[in-house]
Each structure stands twice: as C-alpha cells, then as structure tokens.
Amino acid sequence: MSRYLRYTLLTLLWVAVAAYIVFAASAVRRVRRTGTVGRLEIEVVDSSSQGHLVSAAMVRQWISHAGIKTLGTAVDAVDLTGIERLIARNGFVDKTVAYVSYGGTLHIEISQRKPLVRLLTDGMNAYVTADGYVFAAPRASSLYVPVVTGSYRPPFPASYVGSVREHIDLRLGEIDERIAELEREKYPLYRREMENDRNISALRRMRIKRQWWRLEGSREFDARVDALREKKAGLRRTYRYRAGVIREEIERIAGLQEAERRKQKKLEKSYEDYMKLLTFVETVEDDDFWRSEVVQITAKTTPSGALEVELTPRSGRFAVLFGRLEDVERKFDKLLRFYRSGLSSIGWSEYRTIDIRYNDQVVCKK
C-alpha cells in the first residue's frame, strides 16, 4: 500500500470517528430535549452491617418535600445540582452524584459518612467520624456504634455540623483578630507615651540663665529660679501621673490579650482531648477482647478542664476508673493482668470500683 493511500484511509477513518462523535452528541442532545425521566434509582453505595443513616425512602421524601420534579420531567429540566445540594445539606451524607442516563433513568448515588462513635454527653446527640467530623443523629437512624455518655463538654456547640478542626481554626482565627484589635488599641497609647517621654526630656533641659545685658540682680535671678523650680515640679508630677495612667492602660489591654491567648490554649487542649477520645474509642474497637468487654464509656470534664474516662465492663458489677487518656495501652495491659491474676481468683463481684489511673497500681474499693 502506497504512503498516499495509507494517509488517505487514515484521514477518512478520523473523519468517520469525528462524524460519529458529532452524531452521538447530537442524538444525546435530542434525547435530552425531547426525553423525560421514566425511573428514579437511588443507591446508598456504602451501606454496611452497622446499619444506615440514609435510605432511598428518606431521599425520595426529601426530594418530594423540596418540590423538585423528577418523574415525567424533561431530562433537560431536571435540577440535578439542586438535588445534589439538597442531599448534601445533611451532615451524614459524605458525597452525592445525580445524573440522568441515556435511557431516561435518574440515578442518585449517595455515600454516607462512617461514624466512629455517638456522643450523648452534656446535651449532645451526634455522630462523630474518625477524623473528627460531627453531625447530628438523624431521625430513624439505625447505626450500631459505641456510645459515649457523661458530662464531657466537647469543643463545639451542640448544634454544630462539620469538621471540628475547621471550627477550632475559625475560633482561633477570631481570637487572633481580637488580639490584633487590642494591639491596635495600644498604638495611640504608645504615641502618647513617646510624647510624654519627650516632654520629660525637655523638662530636664529647662535652665535659667542670668540676663547680664539687663543688669539682672541676684534677687531677681533667684526669684526666676524659684519660679522655674516650682513650674518644673508641677510639670514633673503631671508627666509622671500621665505616664502611670498610660502604662496602666497598656497593661490592662495586655492583660486582655493574655486572657485571649489562654482561651486559645484552652481551646487547643480541648480539641486535643477530643481527638484523644476518638483515638481511645478506635483502640477499644480494634481489640476483639475490649470491644466485647467494654459496654459503656462515660466521659467527664474535670473542674480543671481535663478529660477523664470511666468504663463499664461486661464482666462483674464494678466500674473501671480509667482517668485521663494517657498511656492507654499500658493501662489496658495493667487491667488485663489484674483480670487474669486478681479478679479470676478474688471474684468478679467483690469490688465496686477498680482504679487504674495511677502508675503501677490498681486500687480497688468495695
């Protein structure tokens, strides 16, 4: 085959492909202009054995209540973006995709978030994912995850939905802006302080010279010196008082800034404890024995602001005072050794509390 013929055939092939693409696109546009939605298929792509937070029936209800038309609607008129936004408004929905197939079926694919734990603490009723995303527990949800109860106060309001890290960063940014605003309040005070310092320096340079050209006598000169001394003493008192007032105001503002910085540290510590709690729940869930043994996790915020945990085990009638979420593996190892060498021989109903908060100690109370 000659080179010319080969190039000609190749060109015709590409022309045919381009023509097919144009024809197919035209056909799709024609179908979208004239076709209607005949079916609605909703799929929750990651339903698991734990249960579900969202169902096809719930999605149908949302779409119906929102007044978004689907079945019998022209394909081009279906508000796909509106459907996606409507579904995504629910915090327990991670991702959603809506599209209409060539055959006129409206497909809605939904990926739900995977909660790690449910918080039922201090007026809170929310699910939390392993990365700290929080969302309200939906009605009629049936998801089996560990539950944390108690008086623990998480670092976000009960109505919050979203990434807790983003919430913390927003709060920290607001505090930073408040600190900067307070710093700007100091600027006029700094200028007044510098002006006052210049006045004090000028006061020190004030002198009286004898006016020889006027043949000034000693008595007149002494009188002028006394008057200057009195004037300087009065100005000195004024400038010192003014310096004290300015410095006091600067220190007051600095105190407010320090209080804001303490808020930041407290907020960061609260977030750190929050993530430690999630890691703790993961540790329990990842261990076959403790996942079965730990029936309930009770968390509380101490007067100092620290997070402490108490466990209700399946075995016995006692509570395990776990304390702060530090050295978690060491504490669990210590508790397991006590289970095997202590309670197995003493009895599982002998104690009311088992305290493992202290290093190398297990303190039991009847």
Language-model segments: what does each one mean?
Residues M1-D46, H52, S64-K366:
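Charged, solvent-exposed interaction patches on well-folded alpha/beta domains
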Residues V54, M58-W62:
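Generic alpha-helical secondary structure signal
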